């Protein structure tokens, strides 16, 4: 359970700050012209003078945007395809939840727990520090907390 005050803090303060800061960094290099996901998937392509700001704030924006997109007041089940992949990878949905919980609760300091599709097209559970995004590791996030 996450309380309403925490949700407002993350949406109205944290997420908005990430958006403002990444936009300010990108304004310094309008020639980049790529979308944020593409930039974070290839961080070496980001000009050095704004690279860390884009990684930190762009990651914060994308991480939170996915989080908001996936939020629902209703409990939902994975699609049949995702459920089959979870069973094939983790053995059961309960084992997946245990792995995801471990990724979230063992992260030292701030960060995110993720369910991702890796470069081989397989599911995995991982975590990233601070506002780092799995996109920078060549992984596609499908669930983040």
From Swiss-Prot:
Effect seen on changing residue 135 to I: In strain: NEM895
InterPro entries cross-referenced by the UniProt entry: Mn/Fe_SOD, Mn/Fe_SOD_C, Mn/Fe_SOD_N, Mn/Fe_SOD_N_sf, SOD_C_sf
Catalytic activity: 2 superoxide + 2 H(+) = H2O2 + O2
Binding sites annotated in the UniProt record for Mn(2+): 10, 64
Top-rank taxon: Bacteria
One Pfam family cited in the UniProt record for this chain: Sod_Fe_N
SUPFAM superfamilies, alphabetized: Fe,Mn superoxide dismutase (SOD), C-terminal domain, Fe,Mn superoxide dismutase (SOD), N-terminal domain
Cofactor note: Binds 1 Mn(2+) or Fe(3+) ion per subunit.
Residues annotated to bind Fe(3+): 10, 64
Keywords: Iron, Manganese, Metal-binding, Oxidoreductase
GO cellular component, one term: cytoplasm
Molecular-function GO terms, alphabetical: metal ion binding; superoxide dismutase activity
Keyword field contains Cell membrane: no
Record EC number: 1.15.1.1
Top EC group: oxidoreductase
Main function: Destroys superoxide anion radicals which are normally produced within the cells and which are toxic to biological systems. Catalyzes the dismutation of superoxide anion radicals into O2 and H2O2 by successive reduction and oxidation of the transition metal ion at the active site.
PANTHER family: 37S RIBOSOMAL PROTEIN S26, MITOCHONDRIAL (PTHR43595), SMALL RIBOSOMAL SUBUNIT PROTEIN MS42 (PTHR43595:SF2)
Protein's recorded name: Superoxide dismutase [Mn/Fe]
